[in-house]
């Protein structure tokens, strides 16, 4: 088992790994819409969704995978009213079939984020 860290995605905000690689499966921690270079949160749900997915891509690339390897995602949104917007953007990042997914509305996310996305990928 290997803990993954890359500077191409935001550093963990607490005591957890950006991802854990167990050999056949990679478990990615939730990514917010934070710019990895500055730590700044993108403005609005559209920009945050794009950045969260870019951050997941960067973590997966660190272990030689892409979003095409993703089999499951969990999307956390602060407002289910943003569901359609998140879906529209999310759908543009996956080619060759969508992974299984859950979407959950929660009371709050770190740093006041509006969306967080985590994933599980396989080799």
Q: Which residues make up each language-model segment?
A:
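Short, polar/acidic, helix-capping and beta-turn segments at strand->helix junctions
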Residues: 1-123
């Amino acid at each position: 088992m290997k803990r993954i860290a890359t500077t191409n995605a935001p550093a963990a905000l607490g005591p957890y790994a950006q991802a854990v690689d167990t050999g056949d499966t990679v478990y990615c921690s939730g990514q917010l819409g934070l710019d990895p270079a500055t730590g700044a949160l993108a403005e609005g749900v559209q920009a945050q969704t794009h950045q969260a997915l870019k951050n997941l891509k960067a973590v997966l690339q660190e272990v030689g995978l892409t979003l095409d390897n993703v089999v499951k995602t969990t999307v956390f949104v602060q407002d289910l009213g943003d569901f359609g917007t998140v879906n529209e953007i999310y759908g543009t990042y996956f080619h060759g079939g969508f992974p299984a997914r859950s979407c959950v509305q929660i009371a709050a996310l770190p740093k006041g984020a509006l969306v967080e996305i985590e994933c599980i990928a396989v080799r």
